[in-house]
């Protein structure tokens, strides 16, 4: 029996979880325009109140993946994404975007997925534009960037046309919904390795197990005690790491890596331009808090890529990427390739 909007909403009122097949059915209908905007809003709000399960998120991600415009790169086996959920209350600069260039400079192949700011001061698309990168590329042009420069950016709206029915509802609702979780799980290039920052500690284990169900290979899902959706330089970071088919949960602290503690305020920005200036400074060799948090997060990306044996090794390789100028060169390459497209 097809999961009609009325039946789906009744299931949520009854606090009943959906099976994998039921969630596939509902998502296909939402993405196909069968639900009205009011029904989509009711479904998303009800699902949030009930609480999303691994099965439900995985099924929804499968539908979004199937409907997305793919980026066909030459070898996707060791591709890394640093896309997070967004939604953290901090005003930090775009750490994951800076980390992507540093990881690429160390030899990791980066296929970064992202969009514009929703609740933050600057989304990855916003800061990349401020850095001079053309984000309006076709899937084929993004693939060329990854193949030739080792890094490419996939602007989410260009790859998820089926979101046209749900996107306006998300904006109007103004609260976090399941779609905040799906962005990092629907990489159009099929990256199976990623560092995913999340806005809530309760999501760390949930999303790591969801990515396991979706076939990811090496993933670190992170959230810090100070509220950051990054590996923090000021507090403990909660981690769920998927590797070799197993999820292990643990805590990281900057002291483990001989990192000094910093105040979060030291990396706050008000807009994409300020964020781009900090990133350019870090890539150009500037020392200080911004560099330290980038080292931690780029080190994680290098580690999950498979070219570092552990996080400590990844951090060391990240430092070399910055100090050698390799990370800055990756930004220059991506700018040139994207602008020439």
UniProtKB/Swiss-Prot annotation:
UniProt-annotated binding residues for 5-phospho-alpha-D-ribose 1-diphosphate: 84, 94-97, 112-120, 124
Record's keyword terms, sorted: Amino-acid biosynthesis, Aromatic amino acid biosynthesis, Glycosyltransferase, Magnesium, Metal-binding, Transferase, Tryptophan biosynthesis
Cofactor note: Binds 2 magnesium ions per monomer.
GO cellular component: cytosol
Cofactor: Mg(2+)
Binding annotation for anthranilate 2: 170
Cited PANTHER family: ANTHRANILATE PHOSPHORIBOSYLTRANSFERASE (PTHR43285:SF2)
Family: Belongs to the anthranilate phosphoribosyltransferase family.
HAMAP family documented for this protein: TrpD (MF_00211)
UniProt subunit comment: Homodimer.
Protein name, as recorded: Anthranilate phosphoribosyltransferase
Organism whose genome encodes this protein: Methylobacillus flagellatus (strain ATCC 51484 / DSM 6875 / VKM B-1610 / KT)
Origin organism lineage: Bacteria, Pseudomonadati, Pseudomonadota, Betaproteobacteria, Nitrosomonadales
Gene behind this protein: trpD
């Amino acid at each position: 029996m097809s999961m009609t909007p009325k039946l789906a909403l009744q299931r949520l009122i009854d606090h009943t979880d959906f099976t994998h097949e039921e969630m596939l059915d509902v998502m296909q209908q939402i993405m196909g325009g069968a639900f009205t905007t009011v029904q989509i809003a009711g479904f998303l709000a009800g699902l949030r109140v009930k609480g999303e399960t691994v099965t439900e998120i995985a099924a929804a991600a499968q539908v979004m993946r199937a409907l997305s415009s793919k980026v066909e790169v030459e070898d996707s086996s060791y591709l890394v994404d640093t896309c997070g959920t967004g939604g953290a209350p901090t005003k930090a600069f775009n750490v994951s975007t800076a980390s992507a260039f540093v990881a690429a400079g160390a030899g990791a192949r980066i296929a970064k997925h992202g969009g514009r700011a929703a609740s933050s001061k600057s989304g990855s698309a916003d800061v990349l534009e401020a850095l001079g990168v053309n984000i309006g590329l076709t899937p084929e042009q993004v693939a060329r960037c990854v193949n030739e420069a080792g890094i490419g950016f996939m602007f989410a709206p260009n790859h998820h046309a089926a979101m046209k029915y749900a996107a306006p509802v998300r904006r109007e609702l103004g609260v976090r919904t399941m779609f905040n979780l799906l962005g990092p799980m629907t990489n159009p290039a099929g990256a199976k390795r990623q560092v995913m920052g999340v806005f809530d500690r309760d999501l760390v284990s949930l999303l790591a197990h969801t990515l396991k169900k979706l076939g990811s290979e090496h993933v670190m899902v992170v959230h810090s005690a100070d509220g950051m959706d990054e590996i923090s330089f000021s507090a403990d970071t909660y981690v769920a790491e998927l590797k070799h088919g197993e999820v292990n949960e643990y805590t990281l602290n900057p002291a483990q890596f001989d990192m000094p503690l910093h105040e979060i305020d030291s990396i706050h920005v008000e807009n994409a331009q300020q964020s781009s200036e900090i990133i350019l400074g870090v890539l150009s060799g500037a020392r200080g808090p911004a560099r330290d948090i980038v080292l931690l997060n780029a080190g994680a990306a290098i580690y999950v890529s498979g070219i570092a044996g552990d996080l400590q090794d990844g951090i060391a390789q990240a430092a070399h990427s910055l100090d050698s100028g390799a990370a800055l060169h990756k930004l220059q390459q991506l700018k040139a390739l994207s602008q020439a497209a």
